[in-house]
Amino acid sequence: MGLWRRMALVVVSVVATPLVLGGCTTERKAPVRLAEREAPAPEPEPEPELTLTPADRSRDVPVSAEVTARVTGGKVVVVRIADDKGMLVRAERREDGSAWVPTVALRPRSTYTVEAIAVGDAGRTTTRTTTFTTMPTSTKPQVTSTLYFADGRTYGTAMPVTIGFDPPIARAARADVQRRLFVTTDPPQPGVWSWLDDGSQVYHRAPDFWRPGTTISVRAALEGLPIGENLVGDADRTATSRIGRQVALEVDNATKQMRVLRDGKVIRKIPVSLGKPSTPTSSGKMVIMEKHQRTTFDTRGEPNGGYVVNVADAQRLTWGGEFIHGAPWSVSDQGHRNVSHGCTNVSPADADWLMKVTQVGDLVTFTGTEVRLQAGNGWTAWNTSWEQFVKGSALPVPAGPRPTPPATPRPGAVAGGSPTPGPAASTS
């Protein structure tokens, strides 16, 4: 057999074999299959790229530091933070996934190790570690923060989460501070932080009133937080409380009457005497801030003051000293004329009844008086429209949450309707 004959037989044998294995077919696909079988193996998928901060060997890291794990071509599945003794540090991931926030401030002058694991789109994993050291306790002046939301309480449906700052927070530093303020609700309800113009207070509220029975947990994680160039935060503050029944008070100067509403229904009307023209009561939407069975009003240190009086069943509405309280000396005026220094006078019996019905966090609305409530004179989060409130956030606010129109357009309506916009000008 010649050389060309032998070569022809070999080629036929190779080509014919797939035809036999393929079964009864007339299609000649063997050359294609041969080419596929001889193609080079695909390149292995690259590992996901994983970057951690604080960067490895970082020093003088603030005790408020958060851990970020950024990945390209995959997703982060594990982040562990451990102290220098190997004890794990609990951390919670931000809702937007941008960082892991330790649930307590880190210790000063301490070393921490972060381990993160990411899985690539093709299933490959990569692990990265970083070690950093926190700064010593700062010697910079502290901003004193006050959380006006106590632990283990029951509040009214209009209760805003309020934090005060001394000194006030400069506009340029507000975004950094706001990122360290956390509110969670059960059941979930959207909410937004909004700053007073002067930076002395920040409020958190929902578009509508809180639902009765809601549990609200708050954390102001400010300990060691750099605030601007020359200040630091003072402490981490936390609290968890619940929202009680829906109660609202409406006071009309024209009629000298207070309407008390529970779940949107009037349950009592009370005659009142408000501030006389020289010391008028403010019009606007306020929130009950404090309740005292007995207290003393002493205005001798004020320019237009000069009296001391003991009062019973007093409920604070403003920082400037407007209260609802029992006033036996003005019972004959209540429902007819205004004689007070700015407070809302009611009879001792009505004051006692109100103390049993109201909660800190209940909404109180005044209409028809000579002056308007000043922003920040009390917890004035409801004394503006939702659209204006959102503009006070130092961070972008996702579009979406808006107030639900109430069935009855009045501030005492059941949660599900925000009060109509109120004034926010100056008061005396």
Task: Describe each region flagged by the PLM.
Residues 2-245, 400:
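Acidic, low-complexity Ser/Thr/Gly/Pro-rich repeat segments typical of extracellular/periplasmic
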Residues 68, 113-115, 129, 162, ...:
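Extracytoplasmic/secreted envelope proteins and their assembly/folding machinery
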Residues 68-70, 80, 113, 162-164, ...:
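Soluble periplasmic/extracytoplasmic beta-strand elements of cell-envelope proteins
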Residues 78, 115, 257, 313-314, ...:
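Conserved beta-strand and immediately adjacent loop positions that scaffold enzyme active sites
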Residues 92, 194, 265-274, 376:
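Short amphipathic beta-strand/extended segments with alternating polar/hydrophobic composition
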Residues 118-120, 222-224, 264, 294, ...:
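Short, charged beta-turn/beta-strand-edge "cap" motif at the junction between a beta-strand
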Residues 157, 245, 283, 292, ...:
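Exported/periplasmic cell-wall-interacting domains
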Residues 227-332:
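Gly/Pro-biased beta-strand-loop elements
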